[in-house]
């Protein structure tokens, strides 16, 4: 008798994706982040669901409803902080996953890569609207500043901003719709993740060497299920350590002050995971130019497959490209640091130089290094 997992219409799909999936035998721990992102998403949806049961999306009660969750709801404090720090873990895994893709040439799978970029935008949108919900000072002013950027769009800008706000400023209508968006977007992310996996399973996984591994595949279960469980345990350990020992480490103290439209915080800045993009936005002294640079800083990822000039897929055997990749990582860390600093000397010039280097590395230096490596290896 054939095994039910191979014949049942639903179990067959799960089996082909997570049990009998032929997987390269040499994929490293950098390949763990995909499953960790899935775990983060499920955690965020579950904690978010329980928070939504007690939260009220109204300007007069939003802040106090979050306080109520932390003080009066059974284990509300841990649910709230797991959700807030879970977002940070989500972005850590996301950036590691993207870095892995960039380093080992996963962008050669065009469809998977492009769905990944759409997923990144969706996750960023979800995190942004979610940050507005506690209705603290940074929530309010963050929403005001970021939505206001759309007013830089010629002709329709102002109308567009007021349409998003649902009025002439960030107010009750804005909060209500942001809550609605924050509730629906994770399910859109879930659907897009399915599409991401469908495209990935069309080609099979890449591996550290970047060489076709069809002749050396092993079943996903038990080899990679056990490896993923280890990764998951380490992620849960990190999340719980952060949540239980330093829940506010990555947050902003200003968000413990209720939103006040009449008082602007000294330094308006987003959460840490958006600081690199915020630094790029601020490094251009023109509103429209800054907005375009902000968009391009992420959209540039869509150009990466077209800029892949190397004859080898992975950077594993390409020392010049490896060096530039780590320069890019250092540059992004520098931008993240600058994004959290006030707009004054020397931070302004450092931010501008780091922004120029970011675009220069991806558009010019890395493709050029690949061509030089081709020449040196007489490929």
Curated annotation (Swiss-Prot):
InterPro entries, per database record: Cyt_b/b6_C, Cyt_b/b6_C_sf, Cyt_b/b6_N, Cytb/b6-like_sf, Cytochrome_b, Cytochrome_b_C_euk/bac, Cytochrome_b_N_euk/bac, Di-haem_cyt_TM
Any Pfam family the entry gives: Cytochrom_B_C
Localization annotation: Mitochondrion inner membrane
Cofactor, free-text remark: Binds 2 heme b groups non-covalently.
GO terms under biological process: mitochondrial electron transport, ubiquinol to cytochrome c
Annotated heme b b566 binding sites: 97, 196
Free-text function comment from the UniProt entry: Component of the ubiquinol-cytochrome c reductase complex (complex III or cytochrome b-c1 complex) that is part of the mitochondrial respiratory chain. The b-c1 complex mediates electron transfer from ubiquinol to cytochrome c. Contributes to the generation of a proton gradient across the mitochondrial membrane that is then used for ATP synthesis.
Annotated family: Belongs to the cytochrome b family.
Protein known as: Cytochrome b
Primary gene name: MT-CYB
